Amino acid sequence: MEPKQTADARDSPPLLVFLEPAAEEVTAHTAPLSPNPQSARAAPGSAVRFFSDSAREEEAGEDEPLLKKSGPVSPRAARKGRTRLSSSSDRENMSGGHVGNGEFNVILDDLEFADIIHRAEQAIESGVFPERISQGSSGSYFVKDPKGKIIGVFKPKSEEPYGHLNPKWTKYFHKICCPCCFGRGCLVPNQGYLSEAGAYLVDEKLGLGVVPKTKVVWLVSETFNYSAIDRAKSRGKKYALEKVPKVGRKFHRIGLPPKVGSFQLFVDGYKEADYWLRKFETDPLPENTRKQLQCQFEKLVILDYVIRNTDRGNDNWLIRYDSQDDDELMEKGDDFPLKDWKEIKEPVIKIAAIDNGLAFPFKHPDEWRAYPFHWAWLPQAKVPFSQETRDLILPRISDMNFVQDLCEDLYELFKTDKGFDKATFEKQMSVMRGQILNLTQALKDGKTPIQLVQMPRVVVERSCSGSQGRIVQMSNAFTQTFHCRKPFFSSW
């Protein structure tokens, strides 16, 4: 990539029933699938970080760490190996002197990702700072390794489009000039970093493989946008440590406060989808490669639909197309041995779904804008879902235990946010369950992506008697409701 970056149906089969919408809002109760203990397994989640006691002190303008080191670790966290602990040496380092990035992220369940974060921290400590990305309406940064190579994209929570430290003025003018359309009324404000990590979690659970690895981490850099107060306090503490070491060593932290945000691995060789889609119109793909693209496209559709991405244009998903041009082969001429022609591989095409920070709404868009999926107008959206995609997805999402497991994993991720509200989270999951119900029906009926997005919008809420456990029992019921209110500007 270039640097751009209920009436309980106890006697009926245990299936969610897809209802046709009536003129008014319709409500029905359905019983889920029978328990399947094999599906109740742990799933990958986000990176979690535990601060040492001395590092918990909060400076003005930044969020304090939310996970406490003291107290018992939940069985779920212990089972998944998600616990992150700061060592005693970390506490000693934090109690005085300069605090490096290494004290903030100790990732135990993904050594490869931990190594990448470690290299990013080393680069920052050696003066190779993250570079702010000029595109977009928020503060996001290309993170580099000590050699200056881009290895990831970091999006701090405090610099999100509606964050208080957003360094770009686009949203400020939006708020002043058009306050009635400011923000997205269907989204939880300032949770974009969790949405990014949540999209990767959903992608991995469904086996899609289109979202680059994304987790929640903490980083510190001079190039991040800090308030004047934070920078002044940092300078004052450093000065005190230099002039009066006895006093300076008593500070809990020397330097700028860490920022929490999403860290997504950088993908090489990808370009914006718009670029390749235009090129494919004039230079059609070989049949096998076209099928590859269609399969990858269907995975993008499923991801966006399940998480109800409200910001999917053709400029924020990427395509990588590896092929050997005919001209390049002709240039080799006689120097290219005949036996090697048989070893020429077919072109490979891959899709990367980036920019997933505006997803997981707590209600369907029903105010000013519909926030449509822009891929719905592509020719690929008019082709029915392939059998390969149906075989991959249907066995998973047809099992309500799998869906419950997915909701539990998202809960473990989202609850780490300082402003987490369980009631709002349950509304987010109700929308997601409705999307999954529609997707299940569409795959069974052999519908196309465009027909999928035209299906009635559904919310599947947990009934009051429903259990909160991981294994869904037959007595657990969900209420299916059709959302009939449409936004003022609607595309379908």
From Swiss-Prot:
Region listing for Catalytic loop, in residue ranges: 308-316
Catalysed reaction, written as an equation: a 1,2-diacyl-sn-glycero-3-phospho-(1D-myo-inositol) + ATP = a 1,2-diacyl-sn-glycero-3-phospho-(1D-myo-inositol 4-phosphate) + ADP + H(+)
The organism of origin for this protein: Xenopus tropicalis (Western clawed frog)
PANTHER family linked to this entry: PHOSPHATIDYLINOSITOL 4-KINASE TYPE 2-BETA (PTHR12865:SF6), PHOSPHATIDYLINOSITOL 4-KINASE TYPE-II (PTHR12865)
Cellular compartments annotated: Cytoplasm, Cytosol; Golgi apparatus membrane; Endoplasmic reticulum membrane; Cell membrane
Enzyme class: transferase
Membrane topology: Peripheral membrane protein
Domain PI3K/PI4K catalytic: 127-462
Start and end residues of each stretch annotated as Activation loop: 353-373
Protein name: Phosphatidylinositol 4-kinase type 2-beta
Segments of this protein annotated with the region Important for substrate binding: 160-162
Stretches for region Disordered: 1-98
One of the protein's GO biological processes: phosphatidylinositol phosphate biosynthetic process
Chain positions covered by the region annotation Important for interaction with membranes: 168-181, 271-279, 368-377
InterPro entries in the cross-refs: Lsb6/PI4K2, PI3/4_kinase_cat_dom
Family recorded in the similarity comment: Belongs to the PI3/PI4-kinase family. Type II PI4K subfamily.
Segments of this protein annotated with the region G-loop: 133-139
CC per GO annotation: cytosol; early endosome membrane; endoplasmic reticulum membrane; Golgi membrane; plasma membrane
